Amino acid sequence: IRDAQESRGLGDVYKRQDYKVTDNFKVGFQFNGARMLPADTKSVATALRAAPVAHVFNEEYGLYTTLPGFQKAQMNNPMVDVELKANTTKAENYRASGNVYGEWDFLKHFQFKVVYSMDYSSNSTRKYTPIIKVFDNSVEGKVETLGDGKTGVSQEKQTETKVQSDYLLTYQNTWGEHSLTATAGFTTYYNELELLGAARTQGVGLVIPNNPDKWYVSIGDAGTATNNSTQWERSTVSMLGRILYNYKGRYLFNGSFRRDGSSAFSYTGNQWQNFYSIGAGWLMSEEEFMKDITWLDMLKLKGSWGTLGNQNLDKPYPAEPLLSNAYSAVFGTPSAIYPGYQLSYLPNPNLRWEKVEAWEVGAEANFFRNRLHFEGVYYKKTTKNLLAEVPGISGTVPGIGNLGSIENKGVEIALNWRDQIGDWGYNIGGNLTTIKNKVLS
């Protein structure tokens, strides 16, 4: 038996296939693909910050003007970006994502499912730097050339791959007024990024034409070549378990456990961390003593406690040193320039998982034939071993560490009314949130 779905649009494609091989075994796959040509848009931030008293354009010289002296060192006339830098970027992005799975039901109450997912993207960008002249009444000749007065081109190619595999064993059973679902699993996640960029400016008297067909670094002066690159890999491995139980459909309980390992801390000995959660709910409106309340359709009381982890930092290898180009020096006879390197940040061999402990209690209710919905929650969250970067001071490089603890607590209340008048439906809602933050250490 096959179940299929396919769609195509301008620059994208979607396809899904499911096959029932036997009565208790099925396989399938899903695929998404897209080709995107991002528009060469310009930021509006400069326009918002520009002093409104400045003249935009000088009619006599036929040039856009610079901003007043107190601003021109920080930014350009926004019309320079809109008009003179328009259509100077060509980008082409591709993305393909999908998954394949197999699902096997056995021994009446068991199911084993394997899912393999992948997401791949490739982004290419070419940029052109034109020669831009502006009117500036404060300079000799009243005409100023922005930048170094040379045309230039740059290219950048970035690829990113994300791969995830999930292996899940589920037990599900209902007996009498009891219902139980238990899940055990093992998951892996891998993320890799590679970026390579290069740039050149024109040779003496050889202006690079403003033609996208020419925007390749090979057209520039080799003596002005610069380049940059980035590459990193990250991975996590997780073992997990979860239990969902309810009695009579009104007494609810859940509990979970997971053990996560992160490559971010693989050189510190702290890569593994355990996390837990428990929760309970009482569907109070299903009790006999609540049946006669006609204006109340549903009332549930709930509470939960749990821990979560965070491994995310801007630095892919925070426990290892990273060198970057710094100043150069001249040595030897004949003289030669030797590049210098410095630490990009101070590595920390003692880094560990950031851990968040949170609990909340609350209630949900529906009134007046489910037209009015209410939800209220009081929560408290404490973050320990906070992962953060310490800025460098007086020329020193930044550092990374588990720098403290923060407490957040507050109340969240939401009301929503949904109804229909004739053929017209409407929805009115509102919410109230309070939050109090406190630095504990």
Where are these regions (language model features)?
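A subset of solvent-exposed loop/turn segments in beta-rich extracellular surface proteins, enriched
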Residues: H55-M75, K133-L146
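Single conserved hydrophobic/aromatic residue that forms the stacking wall/gate
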Residues: I1-Y14
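Generic low-complexity segments that are intrinsically disordered, proline-rich and/or Lys/Arg-biased
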Residues: E6, V53, G69, N210-D213
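Sec-exported N-terminal periplasmic low-complexity segments
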Residues: T46-A51
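Proline-centered flexible-loop/turn and helix-kink motifs
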Residues: D23, P52-V53, Y61, K108
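Extracellular/periplasmic, surface-exposed regions of secreted and cell-surface proteins
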Residues: R16-R35, A39-A45, K72-T129, E140-S441
